[in-house]
Amino acid sequence: MNASKLPLGSFVGTTLLLFILYKLVKLAYYVGQAKKTGLPYTLVPVLETEFLGKLLTPLIRPLFTSRLSRGEGWPRWIRFSILDWAWEEKRRVHEELGDVFLLVSPEGLICYTADADMCWDVMNRRNEFLKPRDKYKVLEPYGPNVATTEGKAYNFHVRITAPPFNDGSGANDLVWNEASDQARALMESWSQENTTRDLSLDINRLTLAVISYTGFGKRLDFETEVSDLRNKIPPGYKMSLHHALHLVTTFMVKILLIPKWIMKMTSMKEIAIAHGELEKYMREMIRTETAKLSKDSEYQSADAKGNLLTSVLRASAFEAKAAGRKQAFSEDEVLGNLFLYLLAGYETTANAMTYGFITLALRQDLQDRIIQEVDGVYAEAAAEGRTSLNYTDDFEKFQYTYGFMYEVFRLYPGVCIITKMVPKDTTITVYPENNSPQQHVLPAECRVYLNVNAVHYHERYWPDPWALKPDRWMGTIGVTPNSRPNKKVVAQDKSRQVRGTLMTFSGGARACLGRKFTQSEYISVLATVLGKYRIVLGEGMDAKVVKQEIDHLAAGTVTLAPLKYVKLALKKRTDVKTG
C-alpha cells in the first residue's frame, strides 16, 4: 500500500514504531560496547540533555521538591532524565553502582566517576580526554576562549590568558581593593536601612561592580539602582554599558541557551539587545586599549598593572612580538575570553559568596573564629601603621578564613559535573579502595563525566564529608615544607595536596586560571564585612529549613546557586550576643 494512502493515524503509529525500534537497536549496540569495558552499567531511555529530558524537567521537578529538600534524592526510574540531577543525588548513585560506572542510552555511553585518582588522571591527560564540543560551544557567544579550546589552540590561549592572573600582574591586588571598597558600600547600605535585605541581589550587585572595574576598568557604584543603569546612553548605542552588563549577567542562562533571533521575537527582546550592545561596547574598549598600547611604550610595559582587558591585550602584544607576528589574539578571541572572565568573575563568585554568607548566618560559631582571625590581622596591620588591609601583606594571613572558603567551595561547587570525551578507544585506570588498580578500555566517543559532588562528599577522601570543617585545611600532615618562613601558608599548601579530591577549580593540566583572583575577592569581602558586622538570618527565616534547602536544592542557573528567597541581615557586632 502506498504510504500516501495510509490513514494519518496508521502513518503516525508506524513512524513511532520505527523510531522506537531504531532507539532499541542503538541501545542494544551500546549495551554490547558497555559489556566489553568490564565496568558496571545501568540503562536509561532518555538523557537529561535530550530535548525530551529538558521538556520533562520543569514538569516533573515540582512534584519531587519536598522529597528532594529532605535529602532523599530522585527515584531511580527518573533521575538520569532530569536536568541537574547530580546536585540532589550527591553520592547516592555511586553508592548503588560503584565509584565508576557506565550510563547506557540510545545516544551512547557516559562513564561517571567519583574516583579521585581517576579524576586526576583524566584532568592531566588533556590530549586524550577532550571537552565535548557540543557542551562547550554554548560558552562562545562572543568567540573562542581558554575554556572551550583544545590542543594547540588551548596552549595559545593559555600563554596569553594566564599572565594577567599571576601575582606580579597586579590583578589580585586590584580585585582585593575593589572588593573591599564595594563591601564597605554594601555595609553602609545595609546599616542605613537596618533591615533584612535581599542577599542574592546585593551580592550580585557587589560582584558585578567588582568585575566591571577589574575586568574592564569601568567603575559601578554598589548603590546604583537598575533604573539608573538605563541613563547616560552614549551616541550610537541603545543602552548604557552597565545596563547591558546587568541584563547579560542576570539572564546569562537564556543568552547561552536561546538563539538571539528567537529572543528578538519574544518578550526577551531587551535581553537580545543587551547581548549585542555589550559586544559592541567590548569591541570598542578593545580597539581603544589596543590603540593605547601601540602608541605608549610605557603603557605597554610588562610591569604595568591594569585591569584584565588591558593585561590580556598586553600579553597578546608580547606574544605576537615574541612570535614575530603582527598580532596574537584576534578581536574575537579577546572578546571570547572577556566573556569567560565575566561568567566566572561574576556568576560563579557571586554564588560561592552567597553560600558563604548563608553558612555564616547559620553557624555563628564559625563566624566567631573568622572574626577572631580578622581582628588579629587588622591588629597586625595597625601595628605596622596601616589602617586598611591589602592583598600583598595580608591575604596569606587568613588561614582559618581560607579554610572556611575552601570548605564552602567543597560543599557547594560551582560546577557539579566536569565533562570530557575520548575521541578514540582509551584506557582508564580505576583505583578501588583496598584493591589493586584496574584498567578498562572506553570506546571512542564515550563521554567521561567527573562527578564533583560525589567526590566532594566521599568519606574515602573527606571524613565526615557533610560537615563544614575549616580546621581540616589547617593540619600539616602531607603538607609541603614552607619555603617562605615569613608566610603563613599552611592552608594554601594543604589545598595543593588534595589532587583530584577537590575539583571546584577543576584541576591538573586545565585548572582554573583565575582561582587566586576569586580567592582574593572572597577573603577581601569577608574581612571587610566581618571587621565591623555579623551576618545573621533575616526575620522569618527558619534555620533548619534554610540549611536543608541550600544542601539539597538549587536555583537552576549556569553554575550552582542557592534558592533566591533566603534573607539575611547585617548587625553591628556590638549589637549581637553570641555564645
From Swiss-Prot:
| CC terms in the record's Gene Ontology section | membrane
Which InterPro entries does the record associate with it?
Answer: Cyt_P450 (IPR001128), Cyt_P450_CS (IPR017972), Cyt_P450_E_grp-I (IPR002401), Cyt_P450_sf (IPR036396), Cytochrome_P450_monoxygenase (IPR050121)
In its UniProt record, a GO molecular function of this protein is:
oxidoreductase activity, acting on paired donors, with incorporation or reduction of molecular oxygen
Q: Which residues cross the membrane?
A: 7-29
Q: Which GO terms describe its biological process?
A: mycotoxin biosynthetic process
Q: Which residues bind heme?
A: C512
**KO phenotype (gene knockout):** Impairs the production of PR-toxin as well as of the intermediates eremofortin A and B.
UniProt-annotated glycosylation sites, renumbered to this chain? N2, N194, N390
Q: Which UniProt keywords apply?
A: Glycoprotein, Heme, Iron, Membrane, Metal-binding, Monooxygenase, Oxidoreductase, Transmembrane, Transmembrane helix
Known cofactor(s) = heme
Task: Please name the pathway.
Answer: Sesquiterpene biosynthesis
A Pfam family cross-referenced in the UniProt record is p450
Membrane topology annotation: Single-pass membrane protein
Name where it's found: Membrane
The top EC class, named as a word, is oxidoreductase
EC number(s) given by UniProt? 1.-.-.-
What family is this? Belongs to the cytochrome P450 family.
What's its job?
A: Cytochrome P450 monooxygenase; part of the gene cluster that mediates the biosynthesis of PR-toxin, a bicyclic sesquiterpene belonging to the eremophilane class and acting as a mycotoxin. The first step of the pathway is catalyzed by the aristolochene synthase which performs the cyclization of trans,trans-farnesyl diphosphate (FPP) to the bicyclic sesquiterpene aristolochene. Following the formation of aristolochene, the non-oxygenated aristolochene is converted to the trioxygenated intermediate eremofortin B, via 7-epi-neopetasone.
- PANTHER family in the cross-refs: CYTOCHROME P450, CYTOCHROME P450 12A4, MITOCHONDRIAL-RELATED
Q: Can you say what this protein is called? A: Cytochrome P450 monooxygenase ORF6
Q: Which organism is it from?
A: Penicillium roqueforti (strain FM164)
The organism's taxonomy opens as: Eukaryota, Fungi, Dikarya, Ascomycota, Pezizomycotina
**Gene (UniProt):** ORF6
